[in-house]
Amino acid sequence: MNLSKHVFSISNVYLLVWFAYHLQGCLFSLNSTLSQAFWGFQLLVSFYCLYYANKHFVLPKYMKAVNLLVCLVTIYGILRVAGAEILIIKENDSAVATTDFLRHYYNSILPIYVSFVFTKTGQITERVIKFWVFPFIVFAMIEYYGTQSYLLATNTIQQEFTNNTGYVFLSILPAIFIGFRKLWIRYILTMFILLYVISSMKRGAILISIISLIYITISGLKNRGILFKFIALGCSILLFYGVYEYFQYMFENSEMFNIRVQETLEGNSSSRDKIAGVLSDYLINDATIWSLLFGIGADGTLKISWNFAHNDWLEIMVDMGLIGIIVYMYYWKVFFAEALKPSNDKKIKDALILACIYCFCRTFFSQSIDAMPIYLTYVLGYCVANNTKHETNKNITYHKSN
């Protein structure tokens, strides 16, 4: 890899700034001038890439659907800021900033434009993604242990906690399948990631990891020679066995993990069902025609319930109404089509399907569309850029990644 060409490229600087921004509280104070400057840089690059993609490239349907999402959340986000209404998460008595809606959606969606454009212009390649896989894992570990330390410091009674970073680890899977062609490396890294997913004790992340493992096994048995099929099957069996053994270890040695398993078997969803019931009751019995069509505004679920819906479909329906649901359904229609369409590059198809599994499953039991980690969107933009025909627009030519 040519260091002068790749390490100091704008795409890599963007990632480094993103890492620095998400280390606020460790490297510098929360919401400091420096952190705001970092976020401003991210927004500047992201919106420039949004503009550049729309002006210079013939966009695939997936990117057009992302355009619709960005327009929708921008309108509702601006209205949220303009309204300046103070909303509280009653479950922990914390106020939600009026800018949080836009910040979360922008941090989640806009990096797709960055990776799409820089892939088209040759800055992001398969080798570059391979270079970043290990920093992604290291940074996820920093997030994991940082979260654990914070939870221990703020709670003197409990010694074990659920850790949302399990979702972050799981989002690195598509990058592994793009960056590494050797099967044994893929499976070792996948195993390492899944150990952290299980340790996080997030039931949704564990469920997604099981579905992902099933897909990885099926994919390894397709379109390969007999010898490769046996190797893939053997690696999959070892991977499942390793996950099972670690699951057993956690079950026997972690009281919290034991409780989480029992709650799952009993159908206890950590009050999520109660929130869903309250929001569904509102939509059926109390919502006006206007609110059914256009919603009650960004963060609207906090006006009805004591916390966010933790379900994209309910959250969007309450906040943005049927117009939001229609846009979101269209987004998923083209996402599925993008992931399932024939591709000459199997690793891109595998990465897209793993990304699709991760994001779609998460819509039902966690916030998904406004919480996609950059490890996922970085690869998602790359895959979409390389999963389209090589077209030019307004004399701008782009090149296929290595």
Regions picked out by a protein language model, each given a short descriptive name:
Residues 266-320:
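Long extracytoplasmic/lumenal interhelical loops at the membrane interface
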Residues 3, 15, 172-249, 326, ...:
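Hydrophobic alpha-helical segments of polytopic membrane proteins
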